[in-house]
């Protein structure tokens, strides 16, 4: 068995490539507006994003309070690891906004 040579920031061509788009505080913590990761669920994609930004503790803290959209559909109270993603999907990362 060999280890994959794909880094967390490089999509794996055998798995769906998902664009993660950050808004407001999430964008500030990530240092970029968007980036692509591989995964078959929103949970896998978010785990890859966390790994890519593991040296920025604030990034994980912001993700912990965010809401998510996949393909313009709210993830809501679903566990992100149960939300399937497909190649070309956009996962929006939305921090809480002032006023609720």
Predicted segments, located by residue:
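Ubiquitin-like/PB1-type beta-grasp interaction modules and other compact soluble beta-rich domains
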Residues: 1-99
């Amino acid at each position: 068995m060999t280890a994959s040579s794909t880094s967390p920031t490089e999509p794996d061509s055998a798995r769906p490539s998902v664009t993660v788009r950050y808004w407001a505080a999430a964008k500030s913590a990530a240092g970029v507006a968007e980036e692509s990761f591989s995964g078959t669920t929103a949970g896998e994609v978010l785990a890859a994003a966390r790994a890519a930004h593991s040296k920025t503790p604030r990034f994980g803290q912001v993700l912990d309070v965010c809401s998510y959209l996949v393909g313009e559909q709210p993830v809501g109270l679903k566990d992100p690891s149960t939300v399937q993603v497909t190649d070309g999907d956009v996962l929006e990362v939305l921090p809480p906004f002032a006023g609720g």
